[in-house]
Amino acid sequence: MMLKKEQTTNNLKLPISLNASGWLESSPDWSNISGLVAGVDEVGRGALFGPVVAASVILPASAFPHLMTAEIKDSKKLSHSRRVQLAQQISTLAIDWRIGYATTAEIDRINILQATLLAMKRSVKKLKLQPILCLIDGNQPVQDLLMLQQTIVKGDERSLNIAAASIMAKVWRDDLIQRLATKYPMYDLKSNKGYGSKKHLLALAQHGASPLHRQSFRPCQISPD
């Protein structure tokens, strides 16, 4: 994994060769990176209800062997109980981790892509220890972060730091939606977590959207019967 630095005036990027198989953190060349590395991922981008949430996680090298055996790839495929268990482990192992989010009002105002990047930026800026490099899930760099960045498509399958961030963001958002579900029981949020399930869409057609639905998303623009 050869590291080559490309620098511009306001945006620093550090491309990493992604040709190696397995976790990036297990590559012998990972030691070429001197300093803290944060993984950044988001959840809730496709939901109809609630905020888009991002997490930034900085893991020590000592955590890598443990997490490599923990099957943390693709948090969406894990059971809720397993995600919660892993989140507790990551919280204990991590040097630092933080949550950032963008509200439904912000999503409607600036669009979901920009809101997602805003949530990511907020999670990074909340870190008490600033990393020298952020591994960003996806193909969009985060603007106005004066640190090195590397975007990685399907990053939660390539980087332990990103996979850990995915789990922390998912558990945090699911917990929030569970609490909000008691206020809006008609939308079946406990089951769908704010996503467009059949019951959720039927409830939107019957009751209309709540103040926490994304009004810029077409399914939320249905007038109630």
Curated annotation (Swiss-Prot):
EC id: 3.1.26.4
Pfam families per the UniProt record, alphabetical: RNase_HII (PF01351)
Binding positions for a divalent metal cation per the UniProt entry: D41, E42, D137
InterPro entries (alphabetical): RNase_HII, RNase_HII/HIII, RNase_HII/HIII_dom, RNaseH-like_sf, RNaseH_sf
Keywords: Cytoplasm, Endonuclease, Hydrolase, Manganese, Metal-binding, Nuclease
Compartment(s) of residence: Cytoplasm
Domain RNase H type-2: 35-225
One record GO biological process: DNA replication, removal of RNA primer
Keyword Hydrolase: yes
Protein name: Ribonuclease HII
